[in-house]
Amino acid sequence: MQLVILRVTIFLPWCFAVPVPPAADHKGWDFVEGYFHQFFLTKKESPLLTQETQTQLLQQFHRNGTDLLDMQMHALLHQPHCGVPDGSDTSISPGRCKWNKHTLTYRIINYPHDMKPSAVKDSIYNAVSIWSNVTPLIFQQVQNGDADIKVSFWQWAHEDGWPFDGPGGILGHAFLPNSGNPGVVHFDKNEHWSASDTGYNLFLVATHEIGHSLGLQHSGNQSSIMYPTYWYHDPRTFQLSADDIQRIQHLYGEKCSSDIP
């Protein structure tokens, strides 16, 4: 099973990614160990804090490879973030994990308790538009039947093998284009979702998760929407970073004037 998760997702370099069950809420090194087991797929019996795995973690959060796992790093690890395990490569996916077409349908299957359906629809529309604005991709919403990208809200265990963990943990996850469930995007229904700066802004998290569903890995650039942890940006002024644009255009190409309606 291939998947991408946002604690608000993480991909292996060959575009294989699966979400991981939540870790216990430990402090200090116990938490770091749990984090590594979750997001770097280390074996329980293997040495944990090897130089290689520590370097991976530091690179994931765009920090100098000589830094120590200090209080600032511990704080970063406790931020709500994507729950998909990451490999050592956070650059452009060498496998070019992508859809083989430019017109994609999407469907919102259900809604959270704390947002009006119209606000959810606007947030998802704006999220897909962020990606279509810089690529030849065209997104069309459908109300019924199958769709390429399927958006839904769930809580705890929800029959995909990757349960959510309640408020403040994993915010969402998404399956990759070449997975057994391409385009599936799940959000944790236990989170407080909004169209503003209260709780978690659905537009921002959806932009991240849909990026994964299009084939993007996480970025180590903190200005990127594909950065592993959730950071609030004003949706009214939000723009993709140069890193985001470069990587999505690497998969789908640039938007030509003929692509503009």
From Swiss-Prot:
E.C. code: 3.4.24.-
Subcellular location: Secreted, Extracellular space, Extracellular matrix
Active-site residues, as the UniProt record annotates them: E209
Superkingdom assignment: Eukaryota
UniProt keyword annotations, A-Z: Calcium, Collagen degradation, Extracellular matrix, Glycoprotein, Hydrolase, Metal-binding, Metalloprotease, Protease, Secreted, Signal, Zinc, Zymogen
Molecular functions (GO terms): metalloendopeptidase activity; zinc ion binding
Cofactor descriptive note: Binds 1 zinc ion per subunit.
Motif window: Cysteine switch: 80-87
GO cellular component: extracellular matrix; extracellular space
Top EC category: hydrolase
Propeptide cleavage-removed residue intervals: 18-89
Glycosylation sites per record: N64, N221
Role of this protein: May hydrolyze collagen type IV, fibronectin, fibrinogen, beta-casein, type I gelatin and alpha-1 proteinase inhibitor. Is also able to activate progelatinase B.
Protein name from the UniProt record: Matrix metalloproteinase-26
Organism: Homo sapiens
